[in-house]
């Protein structure tokens, strides 16, 4: 075995063997065994889901670890950190456009989804590669003249966060659409739900790993961790994409063909009153649950005096609550519960979670803070699963990427 493809073949064989070992356990021990289908067997499905692990890793790094490190260890102003952490969200509205373009993409290679997933991978890799150095310049740890550093630092840090955010959004939108394309129609909701759970697993696992690696914080260790995450991004996404989407000669450009217009497709999608109400609910609910992202870890560090490792573990608590919520939601939905009602229950669970975080400071109770973080994750999980299931109900065959982009 030699050549540049050899490492990919080794990784592919390793992941496939592990997937088959899990498959041998039987459906009783694999709650997502029913997500597999003849067109997308479980080993291939689990390998494809690796792109969600990468997105979860980046989310844990940006929203969790780097958020606190910039404020507490590097001394960056909280409002500046809030601005940078919020930059990836600027690309979120374009997820719908990315999904639409991947629905109708034509290329000489005959792929629709893979070019967008690879584009997102390279954007995320580039952002992570330059991020630690940009943060040190932003914090003033540089030999550049002060006036120049004051300009270069914010620009470089902003570019790094924007690249990572754009990469995450692009990869996830096209990846979910590819999973939906490959799965049989009756298995699609379970496949996309599995992808969401994989995202949370990535957040839990990477949150714990970052907590362990940065227990004794040093600038050199931060560079190693962030750039290591960049390498992991490339490797896992390559393994995830390897031989997933078949090349189709019918997707090559045709002379004189008029490309579909995004505006017409969007107006057709939102013509349904239910779709409009759904988008409002998703927007407001997501804003409610994500407002805490930029302040939760610095709050634990500055107010409750928790270490970098302890606050990094909060990401694992949030994602762990989300994983539990998915199990509860799956049970409720399998018994015929209304998806929108499940999402509403998630919003209600979030209320005591935020209250616990607020009262943890005057009571000086770190355990109450952790409990609040877990409840926020649980509520967000119910909300996400409920709205995801509702989004699958809004989906049309020709608008798979558009519908998933709108949900994202």
Language model segments and positions:
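Juxtamembrane helix-start elements in MFS-like secondary transporters
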Residues: 77-85, 153, 192, 306-315
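Intracellular loop-helix junctions on the cytosolic face of multi-pass helical membrane proteins
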Residues: 1-42, 147-160, 170-176, 182-291, ...
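Cytoplasmic loop-to-transmembrane helix junctions
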Residues: 80, 187-194, 310, 399-406
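C-terminal ends and interior cores of transmembrane alpha-helices
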Residues: 117-150, 348-364
